[in-house]
């Protein structure tokens, strides 16, 4: 069974993400997902925002295996989103109490962050 990671971040059209950065971020996320899956992880990217809420995220946590939740740098690195960060942590604790919570801050690559807690297991 592979390690299952949900990477939660802002919708790419969120006002805090500059429009000129959105294509680069989308490409980076797509490459990241492919790289993590190639490394043996079940890696899903989930989009949410304070405006859209966390109901879909909660539903995924309750209905799909989740070993860890990686909170993206757009949330972690923005002090204005600290309450949203707390809501993500709270939702994770409620719906997937055994899941590890990981923060991505762009100073360390995602795989390194994930492998602090998990080594990929073969499928």
Q: What is each of the regions a protein language model found here?
A:
Residues 43-52, 104-107:
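Short beta->alpha junction loops
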Residues 20-23, 59, 83-86, 116-118:
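Short, glycine/charged-enriched secondary-structure capping and boundary segments
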Residues 55-93:
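Mid-chain, well-packed structural core segment of small domains
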Residues 31-42:
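Short helix-loop-beta junction
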Residues 87-123:
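Ser/Thr/Gly-rich flexible loops in soluble cytosolic domains mediating phosphotransfer, phosphorylation
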Residues 1-18:
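N-terminal, charge-rich interaction modules
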Residues 15-28:
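Glycine- and acidic-residue-enriched helix-capping/strand-helix junction motifs
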């Amino acid at each position: 069974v592979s390690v299952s990671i949900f990477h939660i971040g802002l919708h790419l059209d969120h006002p805090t993400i500059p429009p000129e950065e959105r294509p680069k971020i989308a490409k980076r996320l797509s490459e990241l997902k492919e790289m993590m899956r190639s490394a043996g992880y079940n890696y899903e990217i989930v989009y949410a925002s304070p405006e859209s809420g966390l109901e879909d995220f909660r539903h995924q946590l309750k209905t799909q295996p989740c070993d860890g939740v990686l909170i993206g740098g757009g949330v972690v690195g923005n002090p204005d989103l600290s309450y949203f960060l707390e809501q993500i942590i709270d939702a994770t604790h409620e719906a997937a109490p055994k899941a590890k919570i990981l923060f991505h801050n762009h100073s360390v690559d995602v795989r390194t962050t994930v492998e602090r807690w998990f080594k990929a297991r073969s499928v």
